[in-house]
């Protein structure tokens, strides 16, 4: 019920604290299945100071718009492109929808179809429904990467583009993006790479010597990439990113908003009003940590993943779904539903997929948290 009179700030705050006591918190060490993390303290400071900035009305916040452009350029550089075109958006879902919309609008096909792996994120289902694009699902190989031959067999005159995943939601698998890029070039189709998770992991992991295939704009067939700074980038939610290789993709989805300050403003994002502070936080975190800072974060996460995978193998009745590629470790057990329910009853925030449990080594996850989890897991599995 909407209150007749207001309430003291402290009283309201105390009520909020009471109502959210059921929430798991990142600092508890219990959240092991999330692809998000507690934001970096510096990013929180940026959000607080610039909370009023609205990138949906860039004529009012000209400086913030320029900073967003610089953030997009830095993300483009990270992804192998000197200058890209895009925006800091609400997350991977919006970014993926924008990519599909750009492909559809440029293709001009009456019955558009998009080919994507069966491992693709559910945001593409939303995109298909919203944009009237039929989704054509490609089969996976035994290692859970997309079957490139099956992708090729599904190409028709109605195909508007192809999707590859660089860090699948369930297993952290990276598709054979080089092969998909070659295929896209052969057929004159654009390739979108969903690197919502892998975008802030793979460049640094490769620099550390991990054997991961190329996935970004270094491959000529890649025309757009989704990358989420609010995951391993440690920027507060919401902060996703969509980067296009060429301006024509942004132009294809831009709508004129003539009444905004500054006059003829073109908007390409789904949201009108957009939090400028989050885009500024993306810029600030990249400036603050740099490549070496993020490489150190990824080093710890990858080493923790390798250690954790090894410890899982020591527990009878527990098995890896596959060796980890990124900082995601997924495993199965007998009586998985019972194990999952008991782990959750003990307070663990885990992500259960079809047939396995996913653990994500985000920056807030420490070895002592995992050691406690392993003790609980072994106890539950042994009955």
From Swiss-Prot:
The keyword Lyase applies. Belongs to the group II decarboxylase family. MfnA subfamily. GO terms for biological process: carboxylic acid metabolic process; coenzyme A biosynthetic process. This is Probable L-aspartate decarboxylase. The keyword Lyase applies. SUPFAM superfamilies: PLP-dependent transferases. InterPro entries: GrpII_AminoAcid_Decarb, MfnA, PyrdxlP-dep_de-COase, PyrdxlP-dep_Trfase, PyrdxlP-dep_Trfase_major, PyrdxlP-dep_Trfase_small, Pyridoxal-P_BS. It comes from Thermococcus gammatolerans (strain DSM 15229 / JCM 11827 / EJ3). Pfam families: Pyridoxal_deC. Pathway: Cofactor biosynthesis; coenzyme A biosynthesis. Its cofactor is pyridoxal 5'-phosphate.
């Amino acid at each position: 019920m909407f209150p007749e009179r207001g309430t003291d700030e402290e009283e309201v705050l105390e009520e909020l604290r009471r109502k959210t006591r059921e929430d798991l918190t990142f600092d508890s060490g219990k959240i092991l299945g999330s692809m998000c993390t507690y934001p970096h303290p510096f990013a929180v400071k940026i959000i607080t100071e610039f909370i009023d900035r609205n990138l949906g009305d860039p004529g009012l916040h000209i400086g913030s718009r320029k900073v967003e452009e610089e953030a997009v350029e830095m993300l483009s550089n990270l992804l192998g492109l000197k200058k890209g075109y895009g925006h800091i958006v609400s997350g991977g879902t919006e970014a993926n929808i924008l990519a599909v919309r750009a492909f559809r609008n440029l293709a001009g096909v009456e019955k558009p179809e998009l080919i994507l792996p069966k491992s693709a994120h559910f945001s593409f289902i939303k995109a298909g429904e919203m944009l009237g694009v039929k989704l054509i699902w490609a089969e996976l190989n035994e290692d859970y990467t997309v079957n490139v031959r099956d992708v090729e067999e599904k190409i028709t005159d109605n195909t508007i583009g192809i999707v590859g995943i660089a860090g699948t939601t369930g297993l952290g698998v990276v598709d054979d993006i080089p092969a998909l890029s070659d295929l896209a070039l052969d057929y004159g189709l654009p390739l979108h790479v969903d690197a919502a998770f892998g975008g802030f992991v793979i460049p640094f992991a490769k620099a550390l010597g991990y054997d991961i295939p190329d996935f970004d704009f270094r491959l000529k067939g890649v025309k757009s990439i989704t990358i989420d700074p609010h995951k391993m980038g440690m920027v507060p939610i919401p902060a996703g990113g969509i980067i296009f290789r060429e301006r024509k993709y942004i132009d294809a989805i831009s709508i004129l908003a003539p009444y905004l300050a500054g006059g003829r403003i073109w908007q390409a994002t789904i949201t009108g009003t957009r939090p400028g502070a989050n885009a500024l936080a993306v810029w600030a975190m990249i400036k603050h940590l740099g490549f070496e800072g993020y490489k150190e974060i990824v080093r710890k996460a990858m080493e923790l993943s390798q250690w954790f995978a090894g410890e899982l193998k020591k527990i009878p009745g527990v098995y890896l779904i596959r060796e980890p590629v990124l900082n995601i470790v997924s495993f199965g057990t007998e009586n998985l539903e019972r194990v999952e329910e008991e782990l959750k009853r003990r307070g663990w925030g885990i992500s259960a997929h079809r047939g396995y449990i996913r653990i994500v080594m985000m920056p807030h996850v420490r070895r002592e948290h995992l050691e406690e989890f392993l003790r609980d897991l072994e106890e539950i599995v042994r009955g």
